């Protein structure tokens, strides 16, 4: 005969916080074990990249609070908040903007020297 199972806690509804799995005890009984909710790794701060960040533990917020800093970020600029590709693009963009400013400054200086002649 099939063994009937009952929840071990008071909540009797099949909600997200009441998910269970079956487990066989050493006494050969089948009982419910409550499963923890699955964590998600953070998304990139750029908002463009679809995936989750690599190198950051995918855990629930309460567990994240207890983790060490090395498990919550990667050792890079914007590590733990932006993905590597976006950081690379941001650095390139900043470099090109600075180069453009220098070019404008040089062109102004040349125009100034042309007027002085």
Curated annotation (Swiss-Prot):
Residues modified to N6-acetyllysine: 36, 43
GO CC term, one of those recorded: cytosolic large ribosomal subunit
Pfam family, one: Ribosomal_L34e
UniProt keyword annotation of Kinase present: no
MF term (GO), any: structural constituent of ribosome
Residue(s) of cross-link: Glycyl lysine isopeptide (Lys-Gly) (interchain with G-Cter in SUMO2): 108
Biological processes, Gene Ontology terms: cytoplasmic translation; translation at postsynapse; translation at presynapse
Post-translational modification Phosphoserine, affected residues: 12
Gene3D superfamilies: 6.20.340.10, 6.20.370.70
Function text: Component of the large ribosomal subunit. The ribosome is a large ribonucleoprotein complex responsible for the synthesis of proteins in the cell.
Assembly: Component of the large ribosomal subunit.
PANTHER family cross-referenced by the UniProt entry: 60S RIBOSOMAL PROTEIN L34 (PTHR46595)
Name assigned to this protein: Large ribosomal subunit protein eL34
Native organism: Mus musculus
Classification of source organism: Eukaryota, Metazoa, Chordata, Craniata, Vertebrata
Name of the gene: Rpl34
């Amino acid at each position: 005969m099939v063994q009937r199972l009952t929840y071990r806690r008071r909540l009797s509804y099949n909600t997200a916080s009441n998910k269970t799995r079956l487990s066989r005890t050493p006494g050969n009984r089948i009982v419910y074990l409550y499963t923890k909710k699955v964590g998600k790794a953070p998304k990139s701060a750029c908002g463009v990249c679809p995936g989750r960040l690599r190198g950051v533990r995918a855990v629930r917020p309460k567990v994240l609070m207890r983790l060490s800093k090395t498990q919550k970020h990667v050792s890079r600029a914007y590590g733990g908040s932006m993905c590597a590709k976006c950081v690379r693009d941001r650095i390139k963009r900043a470099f090109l903007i600075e180069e453009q400013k220098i070019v404008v400054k040089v062109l102004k200086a040349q125009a100034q020297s042309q007027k002085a002649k």
